[in-house]
Amino acid sequence: MSSRPGVDQRFLDAYRLRKTDEYSSVFAFRRAFKGRFFIAHYRPNELGTARLGVVIAKKLAKRANVRNLLKRIVREQFRKARPALAHHDLVVRLHVPVKMATRAMINDDVVNLLGRFRE
């Protein structure tokens, strides 16, 4: 995914889910796509842009550095894909342990999940 000229590629606060109610409304909508490691829960929004929340449970990724790495990977792939995504609130949630996964496998899973939300 290359950047397009004139498209803001930053990951601003406006593109993040922050509040518990925002996460709850996405989970309550009960729509999701499942990948190899992650599940992407989604809900359409009227804000004119896609927003992201990331949930990495300690039960599935015991070490903080692994949880932080997974969140960085998801945020980076979202940042790159956001201009082409439909206007949804997304919560990307880890659903299986990633002990034997490579960084490339995780990246591919996130890219494939986000690809389902292209306009």
Swiss-Prot record:
The gene is rnpA. GO terms for cellular component: ribonuclease P complex. This is Ribonuclease P protein component. HAMAP family: RNase_P. Consists of a catalytic RNA component (M1 or rnpB) and a protein subunit. InterPro entries: Ribosomal_Su5_D2-typ_SF, Ribsml_uS5_D2-typ_fold_subgr, RNase_P, RNase_P_CS. Belongs to the RnpA family. The keyword RNA-binding applies.
